[in-house]
């Protein structure tokens, strides 16, 4: 009986810790009011979830979930990290001539553009991690040379979707 109580308390503690962890503001909140109505009116929103309008298979032909999971956990990959730091050149974004068109790629999907004097920032991730657990999914050396202090006023901010490697809460708040 004592053992079962300990197991129950451990499970309860894990549930509470996970719940509290998920209450952090960087996880967002459920849509309500006008925003929820706008979502419900989207042509992509059906049966309570967003769906692609075109057929978009989650797994390629000839594969199944078991083989994908097996490969993820037990397969060998030599492509996970570059052998050396990525070469990078830091552009002084604060001193760009307004008439100069510029594209600066920061890595993955993050980039800055200046076109006809307007500034655009796409999928900014400058906190050094693309995960709510900072010790996982860290930036590659060489792709982390910019901070939010390096940017001029941004005219347009684009977030392509709400994955951690495209939408960095700490960067957006800065």
Feature locations, PLM:
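Metallo-beta-lactamase
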Residues: 2-137
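Active-site metal-binding motif and surrounding structural segment of the metallo-beta-lactamase
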Residues: 135-174
């Amino acid at each position: 009986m004592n053992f079962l109580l300990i197991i129950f308390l451990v499970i309860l503690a894990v549930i509470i810790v996970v719940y509290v962890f998920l209450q952090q503001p960087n996880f967002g909140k459920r849509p309500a009011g006008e925003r929820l109505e706008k979502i419900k009116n989207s042509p992509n929103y059906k049966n309570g979830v967003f769906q692609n309008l075109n057929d978009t298979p989650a797994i390629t032909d000839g594969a199944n979930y078991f083989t994908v999971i097996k490969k993820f956990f037990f397969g060998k990959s030599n492509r996970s990290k570059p052998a050396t730091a990525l070469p990078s050149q830091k552009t002084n974004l604060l001193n760009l001539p307004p008439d100069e068109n510029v594209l600066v790629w920061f890595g993955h999907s993050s980039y800055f553009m200046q076109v006809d004097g307007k500034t655009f920032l796409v999928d900014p991730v400058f906190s050094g991690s693309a995960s709510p657990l900072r010790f996982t999914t860290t930036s590659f050396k060489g792709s982390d040379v910019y901070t939010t202090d390096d940017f001029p006023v941004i005219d347009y901010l684009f977030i392509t979707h709400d994955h951690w490697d495209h939408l960095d809460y700490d960067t957006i708040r800065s």
